[in-house]
């Protein structure tokens, strides 16, 4: 699969019992398909290992690569490493999870399905592998933006251009209470 064809699809029909392996490469076109995405660009390799049982598929996706996101501090591009290995269990038709011996969540698909699209699964796990706060290492942020943040720290400007102090009114209430 080339990075211009962003679908991660596993053929389910005709998949032999036992282990099968698939490789995919994803880049910017893959992430553009998702609205409101935080990932601007990427270069990731995905190795999908599928173990087919009689009524289940055990899927492991080894996702390794880099993604480009916006720095939360300076808004410049920030490249982050991705290295995650999510697991997914897929059942056919109506699978009784207790009988199958599976404790994790099971995605159930109709037994007539011929393929399984893993796009959303891969996208979600790449996003979950990213840190909550995405910032450059100390000293690597855009110095001009940091200067702007430092100069304007602690002040808010109202619509009229005046600097607002949200706790000023509370201080007045405390003064009046003491009197």
Place the predicted regions along the sequence by residue.
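A positional/architectural concept
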Residues: 1-70
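Charge-rich, low-complexity linker and terminal segments
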Residues: 1-17, 43, 83, 89-179
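Arginine residue identity/basic-tract feature
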Residues: 23, 47-52, 73, 134, ...
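Residues that cap or initiate secondary-structure elements
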Residues: 28-30, 54-56, 75, 96, ...
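Solvent-exposed beta-strand sheet faces enriched in polar/charged residues
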Residues: 60, 81-83
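Short cysteine clusters
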Residues: 71-74, 141
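Cys/His-rich microdomains that often coordinate metals
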Residues: 78
């Amino acid at each position: 699969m080339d990075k211009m064809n962003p679908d991660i699809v596993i053929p389910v029909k005709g998949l032999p019992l036992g282990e099968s392996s698939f490789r995919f490469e994803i880049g910017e076109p893959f992430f553009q398909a998702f609205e409101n995405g935080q990932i601007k660009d990427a270069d990731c390799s995905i190795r999908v290992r599928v173990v087919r049982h009689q009524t289940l598929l055990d899927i492991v996706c080894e996702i390794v690569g880099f993604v480009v996101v916006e720095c939360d501090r300076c808004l410049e591009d920030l490249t982050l490493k991705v290295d995650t290995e999510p697991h997914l269990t897929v059942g056919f038709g109506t699978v009784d999870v207790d009988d199958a011996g599976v404790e994790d969540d099971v995605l159930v698909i109709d037994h007539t399905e011929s393929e399984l699209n893993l796009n959303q699964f891969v996208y979600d796990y790449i996003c979950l592998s990213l840190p909550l706060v995405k910032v450059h290492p100390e000293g690597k942020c855009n110095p001009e933006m940091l200067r702007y943040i430092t100069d304007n720290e602690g002040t808010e400007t109202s619509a009229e251009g005046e600097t607002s102090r949200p706790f000023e009114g509370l201080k007045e209430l405390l003064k009046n209470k003491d009197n």
